[in-house]
Amino acid sequence: MGIYKYIREAWKRPKESYVRQLLWERLQQWRREPAVVRIERPTRLDRARALGYKPKQGIIVVRVRVRRGGLRKPRPKNSKKPATLGVNKITMGKSIQRIAEERAARKYPNMEVLNSYWVGEDGKHKWYEVILVDPYHPAIKADPQLNWLCTGKHRGRAFRGLTSAGKKGRGLRNKGIGAEKVRPSIRAHGRRGK
């Protein structure tokens, strides 16, 4: 069994392996850090490599902290009936992972989001690591596995739901019966929203 398989098996059930102790120590430090932090190397090397990470120039990894649970919606200032305030029990149309990807993309506007993966959570927050690629870097332009990101149509892909997490949230993992209203997009089909 190779090293990546050992790492993968340990992270499948983090509460039952050595990952539990690692997370307990790491989360204490991560809570004190800013919401978006650039890191030197991936925490989950197996997952990062599977999603396209390579240790080369033009690729960075960023750890993002996002809130857990439903939307924290501000309370309207004008008087309304409590029933119509629409503050509690509001579920976002976007997943928390997508929010993390967008925040990383805003922090690094010259880079594009390649993919992201979960690295930890506590009662209040979730942490994701986002792989970012510089589409203008010569090393990326020369890489046959990554140079597809250099074309203009992939600009701002995190904001348009074109990452893996974005496509999942838009329902594009399904096709056939039950997925009639998903394509060409959620907005296009009768503007039913998400």
Swiss-Prot record:
Domain of life: Archaea
Gene Ontology CC, one term: cytosolic large ribosomal subunit
InterPro entries noted in UniProt: Rbsml_eL15_core_dom_sf, Ribosomal_eL15, Ribosomal_eL15_arc, Ribosomal_eL15_CS, Ribosomal_uL23/eL15/eS24_sf
GO molecular function terms noted in the UniProt entry: RNA binding; structural constituent of ribosome
Record flagged with keyword Ribosomal protein: yes
A Pfam family reported for this protein in Swiss-Prot or TrEMBL: Ribosomal_L15e
Keywords, ordered alphabetically: Ribonucleoprotein, Ribosomal protein
Skewed-composition ranges (Basic residues): 184-194
Biological processes, Gene Ontology terms: cytoplasmic translation
Region annotation Disordered: where it falls in the sequence: 164-194
Family label: Belongs to the eukaryotic ribosomal protein eL15 family.
PANTHER family given in the database record: LARGE RIBOSOMAL SUBUNIT PROTEIN EL15 (PTHR11847:SF4), RIBOSOMAL PROTEIN L15 (PTHR11847)
Protein name, per record: Large ribosomal subunit protein eL15
Species the sequence originates in: Methanocaldococcus jannaschii (strain ATCC 43067 / DSM 2661 / JAL-1 / JCM 10045 / NBRC 100440)
Organism lineage string: Archaea, Methanobacteriati, Methanobacteriota, Methanomada group, Methanococci
